[in-house]
């Protein structure tokens, strides 16, 4: 008898799995190995990661998305107002299953430098990469979704996608099979269809129904802040390869490069001020944005003098430790109908996994956008969970077992919790004009900017 090759064996296993699923579906609910609830950026990336893994080729994977497949016939002329800062680590994940090539074929803007500075003093910190390296990439969320969807459609033999499929309820199996109840998670859809899955992955956002239905608790608070987003046109064309962020007393404002002539605005402020910014006329809005980046009205003479003394001392002892200050570009106009706002908050699930369920992305953690880490944390979850599921499949283990799911939870919480705590601390530290705190953060920021090894560690952690 002729031996089966690896690809032939994989096809045979997949056919057996699919025929088993059809047989079960003829007498009861279809059974899947993995069901992903939520087809956003993180959920679709999870589907792509599983669909491309050689150890999972014979597994039945389903992606449930409540909305329609978004039409994307051609690249829009205007930029979307919702963008993400993609780290090199996230780009590596997207490249590993082919989605990054689709993004490169559409559009993205690399940046090589980041400058962060205080509106209440001259303190700043800069992050630079080597001349040939990109520090990160600004990509429109719609383009990321389209790239992932295109790649997923190439994996239709391995991953099934159900659009317009909203889950109504979930039924959980007992921790130990008693032989009476189904050993799988049961999903009831709005159209009356029922599905069974050995592992349910919740990628359904910060108001996750999966998390709530599983009884998984979360810690949360509202910042009483809103993010205002808009697409801005610059006064003149530049290389525009710097990401700018200034900490105002009312909240951080960021200018992220989209092209040589356009940038994306993300301004965190009070809900009342956000409403004003969204509704004011274009000329007033542009003047307000330029003033937010250029005005020194919040400067304190005492704080500025103290900061200058420290800067001089640091420059004397470490003359090559800090990069020169650059001036941000001037804004000439705002793209019509690009202004919008959304509320901000922090949320963290106390547990990412339970028997036959795992949370990823915003379903597990929601963070302030000031560090640009939200979707990157989600992509980190995808890479980690896909790795552990691949190992489980290779070892012949049950994908829904808590054994390897706990390894995922431990690894991701060790990364996510310190990052979320640091972002929350920064938000609170810069949300005041109290002189002692302003002086403390001014001295701390300048000292950090002078210590290249410390900055390299920060960049390495944030780039994962």
From Swiss-Prot:
Pathway: Cofactor biosynthesis; ubiquinone biosynthesis. InterPro entries: FAD-bd, FAD/NAD-bd_sf, Ubi_Hdrlase_CS, UbiH/COQ6, UbiH/COQ6_monooxygenase, UbQ_mOase_COQ6. One of its GO terms (molecular function) is FAD binding. Keywords: Cell projection, FAD, Flavoprotein, Golgi apparatus, Membrane, Mitochondrion, Mitochondrion inner membrane, Monooxygenase, Oxidoreductase, Transit peptide, Ubiquinone biosynthesis. Residues 1-24 form a transit peptide. GO terms for cellular component: cell projection; extrinsic component of mitochondrial inner membrane; Golgi apparatus. It is found in: Mitochondrion inner membrane; Golgi apparatus; Cell projection. The keyword Membrane applies. It catalyses: a 4-hydroxy-3-(all-trans-polyprenyl)benzoate + 2 reduced [2Fe-2S]-[ferredoxin] + O2 + 2 H(+) = a 3,4-dihydroxy-5-(all-trans-polyprenyl)benzoate + 2 oxidized [2Fe-2S]-[ferredoxin] + H2O; a 2-methoxy-6-(all-trans-polyprenyl)phenol + 2 reduced [2Fe-2S]-[ferredoxin] + O2 + 2 H(+) = a 2-methoxy-6-(all-trans-polyprenyl)benzene-1,4-diol + 2 oxidized [2Fe-2S]-[ferredoxin] + H2O. It holds the Pfam family FAD_binding_3. Its EC number is 1.14.15.45, 1.14.15.46. It is a peripheral membrane protein. One of its GO terms (biological process) is ubiquinone biosynthetic process. Its cofactor is FAD. SUPFAM superfamilies: FAD/NAD(P)-binding domain. Component of a multi-subunit COQ enzyme complex, composed of at least coq3, coq4, coq5, coq6, coq7 and coq9. Interacts with coq8b and coq7. FAD-dependent monooxygenase required for two non-consecutive steps during ubiquinone biosynthesis. Required for the C5-ring hydroxylation during ubiquinone biosynthesis by catalyzing the hydroxylation of 4-hydroxy-3-(all-trans-polyprenyl)benzoic acid to 3,4-dihydroxy-5-(all-trans-polyprenyl)benzoic acid. Also acts downstream of coq4, for the C1-hydroxylation during ubiquinone biosynthesis by catalyzing the hydroxylation of 2-methoxy-6-(all-trans-polyprenyl)phenol to 2-methoxy-6-(all-trans-polyprenyl)benzene-1,4-diol. Belongs to the UbiH/COQ6 family. This is Ubiquinone biosynthesis monooxygenase COQ6, mitochondrial. The gene is coq6.
């Amino acid at each position: 008898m002729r031996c089966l090759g690896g690809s032939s064996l994989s096809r045979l296993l997949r056919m057996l799995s699919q025929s088993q699923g059809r047989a079960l579906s003829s007498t009861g609910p279809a059974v899947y190995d993995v069901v992903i609830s939520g087809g956003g950026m993180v959920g679709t990336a999870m589907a792509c990661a599983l669909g491309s893994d050689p150890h999972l080729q014979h597994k039945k994977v389903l992606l449930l998305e409540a909305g329609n497949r978004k039409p994307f016939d051609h690249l829009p002329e205007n930029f979307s107002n919702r963008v993400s800062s993609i780290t090199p680590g996230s780009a590596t994940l997207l490249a590993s299953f082919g989605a990054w090539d689709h993004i490169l074929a559409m559009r993205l803007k690399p940046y090589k430098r980041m400058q962060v500075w205080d509106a209440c003093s001259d303190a700043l910190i800069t992050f630079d990469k080597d001349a040939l390296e990109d520090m990160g990439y600004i990509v429109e969320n719609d383009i990321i979704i389209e790239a992932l969807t295109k790649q997923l459609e190439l994996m239709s033999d391995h991953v099934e996608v159900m659009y317009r499929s909203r889950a109504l309820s979930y039924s959980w199996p007992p921790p130990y099979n008693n032989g009476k109840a189904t050993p799988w998670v049961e999903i009831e859809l709005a159209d009356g269809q029922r599905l069974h899955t050995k592992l349910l992955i919740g990628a359904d956002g910060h108001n996750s129904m999966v998390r709530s239905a599983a009884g998984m608790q979360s810690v949360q608070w509202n910042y009483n802040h809103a993010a205002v987003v808009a697409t801005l046109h610059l006064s003149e064309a530049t290389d525009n390869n710097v990401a700018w962020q200034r900490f105002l007393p009312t909240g951080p404002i960021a200018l992220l490069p989209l092209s040589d002539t356009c940038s994306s605005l993300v301004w965190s402020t009070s809900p009342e001020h956000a409403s004003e910014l969204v509704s004011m006329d274009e000329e007033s809005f542009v003047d307000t944005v330029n003033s937010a980046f250029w005005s020194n009205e919040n400067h304190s003479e005492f704080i500025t003098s103290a900061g200058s003394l420290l800067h001089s001392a640091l420059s004397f002892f470490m003359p090559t430790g800090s990069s020169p200050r650059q001036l941000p570009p001037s804004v000439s106009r705002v793209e019509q109908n690009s202004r919008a706002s959304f509320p901000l908050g922090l949320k963290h699930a106390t547990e990412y996994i339970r028997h036959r369920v795992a949370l990823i992305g915003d379903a597990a953690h929601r963070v302030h956008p000031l560090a640009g880490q939200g979707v990157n944390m989600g992509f980190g979850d995808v890479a980690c969970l896909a790795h552990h599921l691949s190992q489980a499949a290779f070892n012949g283990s049950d994908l829904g077992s808590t054994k390897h799911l706990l390894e995922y939870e431990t690894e991701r919480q060790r990364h996510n919790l310190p990052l979320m705590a640091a972002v929350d601390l920064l938000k609170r530290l810069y949300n005041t004009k109290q002189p002692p705190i302003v002086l403390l953060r001014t001295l701390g920021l300048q000292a950090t900017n002078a210590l290249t090894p410390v900055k390299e560690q920060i960049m390495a952690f944030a780039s994962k």
